[in-house]
């Protein structure tokens, strides 16, 4: 059975405004997430994320509520229908920020079940790695 969502949560030693910039601005996204990034930061805006080892993937911005909620739809395969929804929620916690990331919609992808399961498993591991990189980037 394909899990429908992944949830990860970390506390970052930086204020929400700094974390917001890191998760929404292309020049920061390349410091922790992808090798190249383009983002039109408005609902309906296009995203283009490139990893040299994995290719280029597109997305669409869904929610921009600075500095609290950023959400985007993410299509990981150019030849496949459907997308997952990534919602990043930032909450002040003293001088730090709690960042919660939920990626959902794996069960609704139109891919074969083994591919959906593998994709969810890879992203579960990937978000752990990427969020650790984000935390390190935020305090540089």
Model-based region annotation:
Residues 4-12:
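Short amphipathic
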Residues 7-8, 18, 25-60, 67-69:
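Short beta-edge strand/loop motif at the mouth of beta-sheet-based domains
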Residues 38, 54-100, 104-107:
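Hydrophobic-ligand binding "helix-grip"
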Residues 105-140:
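A conserved amphipathic terminal alpha-helix motif
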């Amino acid at each position: 059975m394909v899990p429908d969502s992944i949830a990860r949560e970390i506390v970052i030693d930086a204020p929400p405004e700094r974390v917001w910039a890191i998760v929404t601005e292309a020049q920061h996204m390349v410091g922790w997430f992808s090798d190249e990034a383009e983002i039109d930061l408005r609902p309906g805006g296009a995203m283009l994320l490139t990893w040299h080892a994995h290719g280029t993937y597109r997305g669409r911005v869904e929610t921009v509520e600075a500095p609290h909620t950023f959400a985007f739809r993410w299509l990981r395969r150019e030849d496949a229908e459907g997308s997952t929804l990534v919602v990043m929620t930032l909450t002040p916690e003293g001088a730090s920020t709690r960042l919660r990331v939920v990626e959902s919609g794996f069960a609704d992808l139109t891919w074969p079940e083994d591919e959906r399961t593998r994709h969810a498993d890879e992203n579960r591991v990937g978000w752990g790695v990427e969020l650790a990189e984000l935390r390190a980037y935020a305090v540089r």
